[in-house]
A protein has these predicted regions:
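Non-catalytic, mostly N-terminal accessory regions of nucleic-acid modification and defense proteins
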Residues: 1-217, 222, 286-292, 394-398, ...
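A conserved structural/catalytic subdomain of Rossmann-like adenosyl-cofactor enzymes
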Residues: 3-9, 75, 295, 301-525
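Short small-residue beta-strand/loop micro-motif enriched in glycine and branched aliphatics
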Residues: 198-201, 254-256, 433-434
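Conserved S-adenosyl-L-methionine
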Residues: 204-309, 314-323, 329-332, 343-344, ...
Length: 525
């Protein structure tokens, strides 16, 4: 297990090497595009080394290497079946990452020299090996964003070969140990790379990536007190960072199955890569591509133990009348507004909550707490009819890429037991460390919020347990300042002291003017 110092050293080394790789591609394409090549190469190396590790383990007693077993016509089918069953894919020995690197750096003749087409074939062979197998759901189209024939890599095959070859060699120099589950290479790489493109014109990293602090907070709140989770879901999963974060906060770190849905094709691929690189077997996750609000890929029967989500804020959606018959949205009698789909995502999550002990932690803009019309009706339905809303937590501004607005966390539970007659409000807007470009929610801030949530007590200027009579009196308006008074009284002003100070200043001013006039008379002015 890596300690904190080891982790930081690994992260610093990775950061330096990623910058070096990024500089190989800089100027030839947009940063948000070259990340796809770097992550794709890192991911392929991971799959390759995982193959080698697994094959060495199962072939140890037979005393043969993977190359020898694969070359044997009698042995090969068994080896391929083992790899497909366990890993979900097959990488031929000649396509192993180390063998491709050897062709780049140690070729003995032109016939053995690496070409970008070798890497393209290796990827196609890998994905092709999953065709007709259940694992295809996890690997189909996974490398689509790494366009190895793109002219921006080079006008000729030789130019593209040189460019990709240099990136592959630099990736081969990154030191990561597959046995070291404490160091998340892909996740760390993604966080570094997102910094390169999140501020680019027209690019919003927040669409794909939830910073570590808010992600950790939601995962902790939603999994509090759970030993394990049968099912975990994120209906706008982005890079799947929040999905994976939940597992870390379960007592046993056990999740039966992960579910996610993502609209953006590039991010959909990244989320599947992230699951695999975190050691989640292909059998244990289903990430779907599609529009969650329009096309629920989960299906009617799926019920989830834990759900976390950071949906796109105030998204426009059709709010078509047909959705009035959708069981996810029909309960409130009104649809979320066309210009603000925020509560439609909440209704989707409520629909998929496990009835026995379902939990949700979702990040949303503050507008959902107090806007009227349809949103007021939906809030009332969630609170009064369903009794699912457990807590409202206000977070600091400027925590996210691409937006400086403050957001809140809504915590919902299907079984609220003794808390069914109240809602907890927490104002954590001052809980942050100021950063250069972005505020940071650190562990001490998360601990303070989670502790207040767990204790569920009134804390002056920080937390308030509001009973239902207060909620009703406020017309189901959940605006946090209505419940948590953060007003700081100013010290009383001593009027006599102020008058004396003014008198002194007047005297000093008059003396200065008299002195200036005296100088001017002496100068004849």
């Amino acid at each position: 297990m890596a300690d904190t110092n080891t982790y930081q050293a690994q992260a610093n080394e990775l950061s330096q090497k990623l910058w070096a790789i990024a500089n190989e591609l800089r100027g030839q394409m947009d940063a948000s595009e070259f990340k796809n090549y770097i992550l794709g190469v890192i991911f392929y190396r991971y799959l390759s080394e995982r193959t080698e590790m697994y094959m060495a383990e199962i072939l140890e007693n037979d005393g043969v290497t993977y190359e020898e077993a694969f070359a044997d016509d009698d042995y090969r089918p068994a080896v391929e079946n083992w790899s497909l069953s366990k890993l979900g894919y097959v990488i031929k020995p000649e396509n192993l990452f180390r063998n491709l690197i050897r062709k780049i750096t140690k070729f003995e003749n032109d016939a053995d020299k690496f070409s970008v087409e070798d890497f393209e074939k290796a990827i196609n062979d890998l994905v092709g090996s999953t065709m007709g197998h259940e694992s295809n759901k996890a690997f189909d189209g996974l490398f689509n964003d790494m366009r190895l024939q793109d002219a921006r890599l080079g006008e000729t095959v030789a130019d593209r070969t040189d460019m990709i070859g240099r990136v592959m060699v630099k990736v081969s120099d990154i030191d990561f140990d597959l046995q070291d589950s404490q160091f998340d290479v892909l996740g760390t790489a993604y966080m570094i790379l997102i910094g390169l493109f999140a501020s680019d014109a027209g690019k919003k990293g927040g669409e794909f990536f939830t910073p570590a602090g808010p992600s950790r907070l939601c995962a902790t709140l939603a999994s509090l007190g759970l030993d394990e989770a049968k099912t975990v879901g994120d209906c706008t999963c982005g890079s799947a960072s929040m999905l994976l974060e939940v597992q870390k906060h379960l007592t046993t770190h056990k999740v039966g199955h992960f579910y996610g849905q993502e609209l953006n094709a590039t991010t959909y691929n990244l989320s599947r890569m992230n699951m695999i690189m975190h050691g989640v077997d292909w059998q244990n996750f289903d990430i779907y591509k599609g529009d969650t609000l329009k096309d629920d890929k989960y299906g009617d029967g799926l019920k989830l133990t834990v759900q976390v989500c950071n949906p796109p804020y105030s998204l426009k959606w059709s709010a078509d009348k047909k959705f009035e018959d959708d069981p996810r949205y029909s309960g409130a009698g009104k649809l979320a507004p066309k210009g603000q789909a925020d509560l439609a995502f909440v209704e989707h999550m409520i629909y998929h909550m496990d009835d026995s002990d379902g939990r949700v932690a979702v990040l949303l803009p503050h507008g959902v707490l107090f806007r009227g019309g349809a949103e007021e009706a939906i809030r009332k339905y969630i609170i009064k009819d369903l009794n699912r809303l457990d807590a409202v937590i206000g977070l600091p501004a400027n925590l996210f890429h691409g937006t400086g607005i403050p957001v809140c966390v809504l915590v919902l539970k299907s079984k609220r037991n003794g808390n069914s007659g109240n809602i907890l409000f927490i104002d954590a807007s001052k809980e942050f460390k100021a950063g250069k470009n972005q505020n940071v929610l650190e562990q001490e801030h998360i601990d303070k919020i989670v502790d207040a949530y767990a204790k569920r007590e009134n804390v002056d200027k920080f937390a308030h347990v509001a009973d239902m009579s207060e909620i009703i009196e406020n017309g189901y308006n959940l605006n946090i300042p209505r419940y948590v008074d953060t007003f700081e009284e100013e010290e009383p002003v001593n009027l006599d002291a102020v008058k004396a100070q003014i008198k002194t200043l007047d005297s000093e001013t008059k003396a200065a003017i008299d002195k200036a006039e005296s100088f001017m008379r002496q100068l004849g002015l």
